[in-house]
Amino acid sequence: MQLTELSIQSQNPFVRDYINGKKEIEPFFDYGLSNESWSVRLDDLSSRTYDRDALADYLLDYHRKFQSATMNETIERLRDPKSVVVVGGQQAGLLTGPLYTIHKIVSILLLAKQKEQELNVPVIPVFWVAGEDHDLEEINHVYISDGGKVKKHKLPQSHWKKSQAAKTALDAEKAEKWLDGIFASFEETEYTNDLLGHLRRCLRQSLSFTDFFEFLVADMFEQDGLILLNSGDPGIRNLEARFFRQLLDKNDELTDSVKRQQELMKQLGYTPIIEGAAQHANIFYERDGERFLIEKENGAFFIKELHLQWSEAELCDLICQNPEAFSNNVVTRPLMQEYLLPTLAFIAGPGEINYWGELKGAFQVMGYKMPPVVPRLQVTFLERHIEKKLDERGIELRESIEKGARAKKEQYFQDKVPSGFTDSVKQAKEKIENIHSAVRAEALEIDGSLGPLLEKNAGFIQDQLQFLEKTVIRRIEEKENYILRDFDKIQTSIKPLDAPQERIWNIVYYLNKYGPDFLEKYKDLPYSFQNMHQVVKL
């Protein structure tokens, strides 16, 4: 493996200006990306207290299923009052989901190791598994290449309820068939049987989406001491209950703070992405396995679908009695994270940078400062045969990452279609139509009822010319097929579905092709947090 870096600007203006350190962004964050921010943040954390022992005890109990001494040792370090964490999170995607999940975990591990050396305090890597998330349509599939086409390979399920990923059961039989379908799309290698066997074993010991995700991630990263915090686990709610009540107490202030921040964002020409904050209490309530967002109006909290209504005091009592029924939304999840963890830094994807910028006031309402928000590594894997095709087809690497190869393919093909031929067909259509129009006019003078028949005849003649043109173009496509497929292969590998590679493809393809040490080699590359696009040549 070889690492190279490219300067590729984000398409999101807010993210781009944040990374470039524009002054307009300062009102949205408490810390910048400069080196001075780290010692300031460390000092700020030293003035706060955390229930470290309760958190460590809970995590040790939760991590028993992984049977990892390394993970347990890392958890014990949380008891040290000087310890801090680097945290990032993602939904519990099948087979770990899109590549950006792996890139985010590597970013967490890398920054934690780097800051521990620089700051001389224990810095612990934590991955926040969004097990409380109920948007299963986002995690119930992976993409595969089928006959050169990118296709969504969805796990069959009779009915997708609005249940948390941590509580959504996996049908083992259906999931194994689904897994076999993925491997059927792969080229069989010397690693295939062992990898498939390992994934099946992880699947069989998993009861839910979150289980399957965590067993895979733990296996990949447990030697790095990565800690997993499943936000959908009922056991974490006892630690969160007190803060849920604080969120209710300051609910109106939270709502107002988000609205003000969003208005400021709009005034500066940026686009907020959090929706409906004014009507929501920003807390979910679970009943019969489904999540419902609590709304508020005139001091009352309610869920229309369930015909439920509470006063603030009644809802606080319910949280005390049954904390497992409550969970966070996009606004309160970052605040809960700040409450539970001594967070040195939050590793964020582009979308998270945008919506965290809407929450600075919310952090202040709860008495916190927003932690430094560090952009995760953005990575493209460049396979050797794809790199060769880029060179052969005259496509720059940067261009392929930013735009793909579709436009180059179209240009190449158009250059192969003789301009004289298309012009000749166009002229023939016009001349024949002019002649036929005159003939139609004479025929109509003889018999006015012939109109429909004459129009049909004219259309038939034009269709024959169209057929001729398409046939010639198809022959050119067949002749140039080998080269045209090269453009398609570049597009599929680097810019599938016109999206960044990291948003579509899954790590299992690379593990199957390059073997179990692929991940170790990838983790050990000399990355730097200089906001450059990382290209890993395979």
Curated annotation (Swiss-Prot):
One of its GO terms (molecular function) is ligase activity. Pfam families: CC_BshC (PF24850), Rossmann-like_BshC (PF10079). It is an enzyme of class 6 (ligase). Its EC number is 6.-.-.-. Keywords: Coiled coil, Ligase. The keyword Coiled coil applies. Residues 454-482 form a coiled coil. The keyword Cell inner membrane does not apply. Belongs to the BshC family. This is Putative cysteine ligase BshC. It comes from Bacillus licheniformis (strain ATCC 14580 / DSM 13 / JCM 2505 / CCUG 7422 / NBRC 12200 / NCIMB 9375 / NCTC 10341 / NRRL NRS-1264 / Gibson 46). The gene is bshC.
